[in-house]
Amino acid sequence: MSAVAIKGWCPGALRPMQSGDGLVVRIRPRVGRLDAIQAVGIAELAARYGNGLIDLTSRGNLQIRGVSDAGYPALIDGLAELGLLDADSETEAQRNILVTPFWTAGDDTRPLAAELERALAGASLDLPTKFGFAIDDG
């Protein structure tokens, strides 16, 4: 039995983590939402460059596993075309926002999450690795 390696950080799209089956590429949907084009695009990218499966994390992110080093650049290009990448890995790591699944049209959840994302993108914060924000206006 092999020892478990604790990395001390979470993977992202721009900072993938090596695992036993290849790279783990984590996608953090903006404001906790995907449109239909993004959802289909992620499925196609997972089938082409990963193991074909998409994992849903406990914090509402998606991850594609089994990505090869050779396929990673094309996967990143595809995620960029879908509007799912941040400017850099530091911004990506800070944008860890969990949005209630019980939001309703017209409530403040989406505007609050969008404003928090904008504020985080321009900030240089020294947050703990697994620090996150949760938004529930109900």
Stretches with model-predicted labels:
Residues 2-3, 22-137:
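Small-residue-enriched alpha-helical segments and adjacent helix-cap loops
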Residues 1-18, 38:
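Intrinsically disordered, low-complexity polar/charged tails and linkers
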